[in-house]
Amino acid sequence: MVNNRNEIEVRKLEHIFLCSYCNVEYEKTTLLEDIELIHKGTCGINFNDIETEIELFGKKLSAPIIVSGMTGGHSKAKEINKNIAKAVEELGLGMGVGSQRAAIVNDELIDTYSIVRDYTNNLVIGNLGAVNFIVDDWDEEIIDKAIEMIDADAIAIHFNPLQEIIQPEGDLNFKNLYKLKEIISNYKKSYKNIPFIAKQVGEGFSKEDALILKDIGFDAIDVQGSGGTSWAKVEIYRVKEEEIKRLAEKFANWGIPTAASIFEVKSVYDGIVIGSGGIRGGLDIAKCIAIGCDCCSVALPILKASLKGWEEVVKVLESYIKELKIAMFLVGAENIEELKKTSYIVKGTLKEWISQRLK
């Protein structure tokens, strides 16, 4: 367990640098390429009438897009969160912040997260680690501190066993996660009835996971499947110990691909599902919505854009929205509810996955 506050801050900066400038993406794909939306040549709608708006966690979004929680806890992270907040305010989208543990243990870092509320009144999602409720004995007061820090509309609890076991300073005790059931229930009764999101960090959730998360009481699941950023790959660049590098290389492609994770979760869970992990454009978003997601979250492309300024973040997100609307036009969907009902086929590896796991 990390006890040194500065060590957490340094790790935050290392993660920003490595994700921005090194090849940290999976070699395998999200399997979204195995989904084909059925083209409607007689689409029968006016492109200019297409509406992408949704309501999520009590907030209206102009499109089903959230910038995933990525960072905080360092002065550079403060600038990134500022740029993202300005961009989502401009476009009417939502955002999350990175793990707030750094500010939980060091109040001096709170402003690297709270700055988002200086620039956006839109949906903001907090972020805490599931493992810390076990190893650090966190309780409802920690959740309330994280929520108050950024006036959060929802709170994500991230599950990252692979990242923890590869990190030299990782926490390895994920036993007794059902402790979260009592904590979430107590928080909603004693503090605020706020939505709780179970969030992966790149390895996806299985149907078995989804059943556990449902029983614990999570209102939403952010699948964050494999095919995007590999945190094992990040550690290959970060750590100096050769044995840890070797292990990170072995598990660099571990995880459930995003599309497969969505099907897994949707097979047993009827709450809100967020598609994420390697989302690289509006067509990916359209596919996720078509197979059952309520919205999508995007991370790495936005992190890279944010280093160039908030205007660059706007450009990337605008391109995603434009691509989403084109996909909707081509399947004849005037709004997101109609997109959820659009026809598609599943082929290749994803079809095989579904036949073995879900039939």
Swiss-Prot record:
Cofactor annotation: FMN; NADPH; Mg(2+)
InterPro entries: Aldolase_TIM, FMN-dep_DH, IPdP_isomerase
GO BP term (any one): isoprenoid biosynthetic process
Summary of activators and inhibitors of this protein: Inhibited by 3,4-epoxy-3-methylbutyl diphosphate (EIPP).
Protein EC: 5.3.3.2
Keyword tags: Cytoplasm, Flavoprotein, FMN, Isomerase, Isoprene biosynthesis, Magnesium, Metal-binding, NADP
Residues that hold Mg(2+) according to the record: E164
GO cellular component, one term: cytoplasm
Binding positions for substrate per the UniProt entry: R11, K12, S99, Q100, R101, Q163
pH-dependent activity: Optimum pH is between 7 and 7.2.
GO MF entry, a single one: magnesium ion binding
Entry keyword tRNA-binding: no
Catalytic activity: isopentenyl diphosphate = dimethylallyl diphosphate
Purpose of the protein: Involved in the biosynthesis of isoprenoids. Catalyzes the 1,3-allylic rearrangement of the homoallylic substrate isopentenyl (IPP) to its allylic isomer, dimethylallyl diphosphate (DMAPP).
NCBIfam families: IPP_isom_2
Subunit structure: Homooctamer. Dimer of tetramers.
Family: Belongs to the IPP isomerase type 2 family.
The protein, known as: Isopentenyl-diphosphate delta-isomerase
Protein species of origin: Methanocaldococcus jannaschii (strain ATCC 43067 / DSM 2661 / JAL-1 / JCM 10045 / NBRC 100440) (Methanococcus jannaschii)
Upper taxonomic lineage: Archaea, Methanobacteriati, Methanobacteriota, Methanomada group, Methanococci
